[in-house]
């Protein structure tokens, strides 16, 4: 899985929502997509009685998905790329910016 986790703030770098930022709500690794809060909104037509949340049915707006390749993780206000680094032991490991330190 690329260096993206649920709860990360990401920036869309390609597509109709290019340049916008949001928080990752859900990862779909088998499809290579992410769902981002309040971005890529799609409308779904819900039949009456299908769900407890909408017993009357109607048209529901919810977040669509974006390809993982079209988003970058933000640290502070800057997008960052992850890199492979060599540790002292010589093992390669995927690395990303330490979000926990910069978030405080």
Curated annotation (Swiss-Prot):
Part of the 50S ribosomal subunit. It comes from Anaeromyxobacter sp. (strain Fw109-5). Residues 85-104 are annotated as: Disordered. Keywords: Ribonucleoprotein, Ribosomal protein, RNA-binding, rRNA-binding. Belongs to the universal ribosomal protein uL24 family. GO terms for molecular function: rRNA binding; structural constituent of ribosome. This is Large ribosomal subunit protein uL24. GO terms for biological process: translation. Gene3D superfamilies: 2.30.30.30. Pfam families: KOW, ribosomal_L24. NCBIfam families: rplX_bact. The gene is rplX. One of its GO terms (cellular component) is ribonucleoprotein complex.
């Amino acid at each position: 899985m690329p260096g993206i986790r649920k709860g990360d703030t990401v920036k869309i770098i390609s597509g109709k929502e290019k340049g916008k930022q949001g928080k990752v709500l859900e990862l779909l690794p088998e499809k290579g997509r992410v769902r981002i809060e309040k971005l890529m909104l799609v409308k779904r037509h819900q039949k009456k009685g299908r769900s407890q949340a909408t017993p009357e049915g109607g048209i529901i707006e919810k977040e669509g998905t974006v390809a993982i390749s079209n988003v970058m993780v933000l640290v502070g206000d800057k997008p960052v790329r992850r890199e492979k680094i060599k540790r002292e032991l010589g093992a390669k490991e995927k690395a990303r910016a330490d979000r926990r330190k910069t978030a405080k």
